[in-house]
Swiss-Prot record:
Native source organism of the sequence: Rattus norvegicus (Rat)
WD repeats: 50-90, 174-213, 228-266, 270-308, 310-349
Sites of N-acetylmethionine modification: M1
Biased composition (Basic residues): 664-688
UniProt record similarity statement: Belongs to the WD repeat NOL10/ENP2 family.
A Pfam family reported for this protein in Swiss-Prot or TrEMBL: Beta-prop_NOL10_N
GO CC terms, sorted: nucleolus; small-subunit processome
Gene this protein is translated from: Nol10
Chain coiled-coil ranges: 423-476, 512-589, 640-673
Name of the protein in its database record: Nucleolar protein 10
Alphabetic keyword roster: Acetylation, Coiled coil, Nucleus, Phosphoprotein, Repeat, WD repeat
């Protein structure tokens, strides 16, 4: 057993426990249960609740007594009696089952849809009848009032098979190329089918006419969803008379009210996997939606996640046991999953003891019985010299190797290599020495802000300590230990923005200066070494070489700066193009603002000035108006006050008119008359 908790909701996995190897005999299994406490405490809720390889579908009968599951290989169906907690019967089939439906309250009437177009009917005694449909089927539903089976599949038609008459009826012609899923509302009998184009078509079985179409593909696309292909309908489920849940192939679940063509809620699984099944839990108003990776339980009104269930293997089908907190899963593994969530509801009547056992479950996962065995390959047997044991009871063939007892493996390992302990001891000593060495050179904990700058300063400090010219190099205080620069490594406001334009343009210069400083330190060290060796003249580079080297460095730095500037210009162009595209896509709409009564709107620029003016007292505002000349207050002989104010607009017009008048006068003064210039008389005949 395993206990997990998500959002403070405990989930008990009843199928996760010690798994016994298949090649163990019954006698050894019983002996192992007596010896091993973990195996003895293992809870096997239903005996042999598994398939040989894979389980594809799982359902519960209406009376809740029988659990039916189909799987492979070979294709088969298994029926489990919950009252006996064991397997009731098993029937092998000719081909794999796509889906099946239990028509009766118990297991006496079952219909199977196979992947080779066959429809198989089973009764309580076994196989009853088999027929075929024209196209490959994917899903079917049973209409109880008319005894009709509706089959959908790789065709635009919905085939109808009447079980009372025993013959096919006229099919329903849909507008889709193919249909994936279908369902019938148990309240009013509405038939719905999900198409490959992402639409849901609803039909009235009484008149065999289409009564509505929902375009779910368009409604499933939200701002947060990333969809690369057209969503198709992969799951469909009715709840009551008016609610319907639709699952898409891109991982969205849409909740609809049949009276509206817009979804009430769109829930995204965020995995991009097709929704396998959808179920409703009415007591807590939850929706259980499952894809091949996870089962999510969320509130159908708000979409808030309640809890989730993520098994080890991929999911093929999910079944919610009615009126309880038990969930059954069909997985891509031999074991079928049984999960119990006490918050969803009580344990079923046939396993009411789970309520007491769940209080004693351990939260740590259990180890498997395979820990008592060691898996070895044929090459390992050759190295150990145990090839002669192949075929004996000491080795059990499994996949590409063998299982052998772990105690036997340790004994043989010790005999083959008696010095293994000494080698192990030496390896441990070497690891300890390496750990101590690593601790000596371990750097101090870097600050939260400007980590790269701090690491650079630490490296420079280490280089100074390693250099032999400690006396000649002037010792500078360390910035990391200086309190004046303490804020630079603590306050996020002082974080160096490496993406800024200033940093990218100055970074080549800073790196070039640091490289020059390192070269100078190396040259000084070489000169010191030469002096210590008492050489007459230290060899060095000629001045021409140094000048050429400095010029090359300068050229490299200039090229680096030009490169950074080109990159910045390119990024700026890309940003402008993106902004232009966004501006073209956005549609500008006029915005309206309500102006208070008694106020006059001039421009948005005066809003700040007006706000400051309103904050002042009445006396200050009167003084300000009198100063500008727009307001004058005088006393009358009667003792009252006379107030005169001038409109700003008329005042501005007067000023403008006076300015124009002065301008005309200046132009008139500067104008020179041309009346003194007269044209000379022309010679020759006048031109007529």
């Amino acid at each position: 057993m395993q206990v997990s908790s998500l959002n403070e909701v405990k989930i008990y996995s009843l199928s996760c426990g010690k798994s016994l190897p298949e090649w163990l005999s019954d006698r050894k299994k019983r002996a192992l249960q007596k010896k091993d406490v973990d195996v003895r405490r293992r809870i096997e809720l239903i005996q042999d609740f598994e398939m040989p390889t894979v389980c594809t579908t799982i359902k519960v009968s209406k009376d809740g007594q029988y659990i039916l599951a189909t799987g492979t290989y070979k294709p088969r169906v298994r029926c489990y009696d919950t009252y006996q907690l064991s397997l009731k019967f098993e029937r092998c089939l000719d081909s794999e089952v796509v889906t099946f439906e239990i028509l009766s309250d118990d297991y006496s009437k079952i219909v199977f849809l196979h992947n080779d177009r066959y429809i198989e009917f089973h009764s309580q005694s076994g196989f009853y009848y088999k027929t075929r449909i024209p196209k490959f089927g994917r899903d079917f539903s049973y209409h109880y009032p008319s005894c009709d089976l509706y089959f959908v599949g790789a065709s635009s038609e919905v085939y109808r098979l009447n079980l009372e008459q025993g013959r096919y009826l006229n099919p329903l012609q849909t507008d889709a190329a193919e249909n994936n899923v279908c369902d019938i509302n148990t309240v009013h009998g509405l038939f719905a089918t999900g198409t490959i184009e992402g639409r849901v078509e609803c039909w009235d079985p009484r008149v065999r006419k289409r009564v509505g179409v929902l375009d779910c593909a368009l409604n499933s696309v939200t701002a947060d969803s990333e969809i690369n292909s057209l969503p198709t309908i992969s799951a469909l489920k009715f709840n009551g008379a008016l609610s319907m849940a639709v699952g898409t192939s891109t991982g969205q679940v849409l909740l609809y009210d049949l009276r509206s063509d817009k979804p009430l809620l769109v829930k995204d699984h965020q995995y991009g996997l097709p929704i396998k099944s959808v179920h409703f839990q009415d007591s807590l108003d939850l929706v259980l939606s499952a894809d091949s990776r996870i089962v999510k339980m969320w509130n159908k009104d708000s979409g808030k996640i309640f809890t989730s269930l993520e098994p080890e293997h991929d999911l093929n089908d999910v079944c919610l046991y009615p009126s309880s907190g038990m969930i059954l899963t069909a997985n891509e593994s031999p074991k079928m999953g049984i999960y119990y969530i006490p918050v969803l509801g009580p344990a079923p009547r046939w396993c009411s003891f789970l309520d007491n056992l769940t209080e004693e479950l351990e939260e740590n996962p259990e180890s498997t019985v395979y820990d008592d065995y060691k898996f070895v390959t044929k090459k390992d047997l050759e190295n150990l010299g145990l090839t002669h044991l192949i075929g004996s009871p000491f080795l059990r063939a499994y996949m590409h190797g063998f299982f052998m007892d772990i105690r036997l493996y340790h004994k043989v390992k010790l005999m083959v290599n008696p010095f293994a302990y000494e080698e192990y001891r030496k390896d441990k000593i070497r690891q300890k020495i390496e750990e101590t060495r690593a601790q000596r050179v371990q750097l101090k904990k870097l600050p939260k802000v400007n980590k790269e700058l701090a690491l650079k300063l630490i490296e420079e400090e280490e280089e100074k300590q390693k250099s032999t010219l400690k006396k000649k190099v002037k010792s500078l205080p360390n910035i990391l230990t200086d309190d004046r620069f303490k804020v630079m490594f603590e306050n996020p406001d002082f974080q160096v923005d490496e993406d800024s334009e200033e940093f990218r343009l100055l970074n080549p210069l800073v790196s070039r200066i640091s490289e020059k400083r390192k070269k100078q330190l190396r040259l000084l060290e070489q000169q010191e070494q030469l002096k210590n060796e008492e050489e007459e003249e230290p060899e060095g580079k000629p001045s021409d070489a140094e000048s050429s080297e400095s010029s090359d460095d300068e050229k490299d730095w200039v090229e680096e700066v030009r490169k950074q500037r080109r990159l910045l210009q390119q990024e700026e162009r890309v940003k402008r193009q993106e902004q232009l595209k966004e501006d073209q896509q956005t549609v500008l709409k006029p915005q309206f603002y309500e102006i208070k009564a008694g106020e006059e709107f001039r421009s948005f620029k005066e809003s700040a000035t007006k706000q400051k003016l309103m904050n002042k007292t009445l006396e200050d505002r009167l003084k300000l108006e009198a100063k500008h000349g727009t307001l004058s207050v005088s006393d009358t002989t009667v003792g009252s006050k006379q107030l005169t104010f001038t409109l700003k607009r008329s005042e501005q017009q007067k000023k403008q008119q006076e300015a124009e008048k002065l301008h005309r006068q200046e132009r008139k003064k500067l104008r020179r008359s041309a009346s003194h210039l007269r044209s000379r008389p022309r010679r020759g005949r006048p031109f007529h």
